[in-house]
Amino acid sequence: MIKFVLDTSIFVNPDVRKKFGETPTEAMKTFLHYAENLFGKVEFYMPPGIYRELMHFVEEEEVSPDIELYIIKKPPNVHDIKIPAFVVYELIEDIRRRVDKGLRVAEKAVRESVIDTSNVDKIIQKLRRNYRKALREGILDSKEDFELILLAKEIDGIIVSADVGILTWAEKMGIKWVDAFKFKEVLSELVEKFKRSESEKERK
């Protein structure tokens, strides 16, 4: 059984979502159509935290009860999952590098504000943008992201996400993943593959 562990970026990230629909609700409807065709052959999982986050964007009454039927909500078993020590070492080192980078961003902003006192507000906005990028881009920056990784490890699932941090750490931990930008094509191919398989069985 193929098991996919889904991130919100499939339905919320505009660049990814447009393959499924214009809005998160339309994207979810399209996805659920694929899930229906793959029912019994492919399973789709979400940690409860990710699911709750997603439902802030999706009109629940328009996707129920299918969303309950085709998306399995499961928390990772945080007490029994073993994390390799090197992952903790890498995470600590990554955080240290990001703190140093954040300090350099702040120092640059201070120097700019001393030189150009008339544009302090713009400099602060730039500081916030660059500081956020330095500290958060490419890292697991929420409990929900970490739950996604842990659940995929626990069930030997395939993570589907457009989040660079999630995919980077999935790779570090030896977890299979699919870029969310290609997920619709993957689903279409799976539907066709199973249809061909059924046709061959009927001919026999």
Curated annotation (Swiss-Prot):
Superkingdom per UniProt: Archaea
Entry keyword set: Endonuclease, Hydrolase, Nuclease, tRNA processing
Keyword Calcium on entry: no
EC number(s) reported in the record: 3.1.26.5
Gene Ontology MF, one: ribonuclease P activity
Top enzyme class: hydrolase
InterPro entries cross-referenced by the UniProt entry: PIN-like_dom_sf, RNA_free_RNase_P
GO biological process: tRNA 5'-leader removal
Catalytic activity line of the entry: Endonucleolytic cleavage of RNA, removing 5'-extranucleotides from tRNA precursor
Function: RNA-free RNase P that catalyzes the removal of the 5'-leader sequence from pre-tRNA to produce the mature 5'-terminus.
NCBIfam families per UniProt: PRK04358.1-3, RNA_lig_partner
Family per similarity comment: Belongs to the HARP family.
Protein name: RNA-free ribonuclease P
Species name: Pyrococcus horikoshii (strain ATCC 700860 / DSM 12428 / JCM 9974 / NBRC 100139 / OT-3)
